[in-house]
Amino acid sequence: TPATRPVLGVLNGIFYNATSTKKPTWANWYEQPITPANSEDITAFVNDYPFQEYVVATDAAVTRAGFMETYECFTNTGGTDSTGVSSTTLNIAGTNASTYQWRLIREAEDPENQDITAAYCSVLVVQSTNQIVTQTT
């Protein structure tokens, strides 16, 4: 399950030599299939600072009691290439004091999506370091 897989970072972008142009290419996301020129490697850049804050949308309303709890994310496939906006949402129904990947800190400073009593409000999360620190295998 997603809850048992620790998050070690968030993809910030990739760098590769494009097959068609043979020139260095940067992309903010990885979209399969990307085959670099001459079967070279793709270099991934990952934000792995455990206290990095991220803004994410919720899939349901949040209560104040849910702040500082941990949550898993639903990875949806409806994101867009043109804006880079993800459709991943924080699974509010799946919460635990310490076992899931993301810890909800507070509502985000987003005036248009700040109502925590509504689904898809913007909240601030950080990685839950409990999974990394207590991982035994």
Please annotate each region the language model reported.
Residues 1-137:
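Surface-exposed, low-hydrophobicity beta-strand/loop segments enriched in small/polar/acidic residues
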